[in-house]
Design a protein with these regions (language model features):
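Conserved short beta-strand edge segments in small beta-sheet-based binding/regulatory domains
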Residues: 80-98
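Short S/T/G/P-rich N-terminal loop/turn motif that feeds into the first structured element of a domain
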Residues: 1-56, 64-74, 96-117
């Protein structure tokens, strides 16, 4: 698994937009699969949470090298998906994350900062 990624979270579907939300899901799966096949991302996955009174309802995680992830989230494909999602779903969010060795390095830098205080 790659050490960098972006998480796209979302809440409930806006009333009356359920069909379009399903179409968006299908489109985003296609875009993500194509990005992996073309080497633009290493992998991706998605999780739906059990119903709750608070968001998020689910998350899609996109993994790759830092430059891959940055290029992908700047792409027109990704920006269009996020724009459509914002019109169809409540509480759409996009956040970068680190994992694996990058997580270890991040905590190492944090530890050095603490020691410098």
């Amino acid at each position: 698994m790659a050490d960098y990624g972006v998480a796209v979270t979302w809440g409930d579907v806006k009333p009356g937009r359920e069909k379009k939300a399903l179409e968006l899901w299908a489109d985003s799966v296609g875009i993500n699969e194509k990005a992996v096949a073309n080497g633009r991302l290493d992998s991706w996955d998605a999780v739906l949470f059990e119903p709750s009174a608070t968001p998020p309802a689910g998350v899609t995680r996109l993994f790759g090298a830092q430059d891959q992830v940055e290029a992908f989230i700047r792409s027109e494909d990704f920006q269009d998906v996020i724009g459509r999602a914002s019109m169809l779903l409540f509480n759409v969010g996009v956040r970068r994350f680190v994992a694996g060795n990058a997580l270890v390095e991040t905590f190492g830098r944090y530890s050095k900062l603490i020691d410098s205080l």
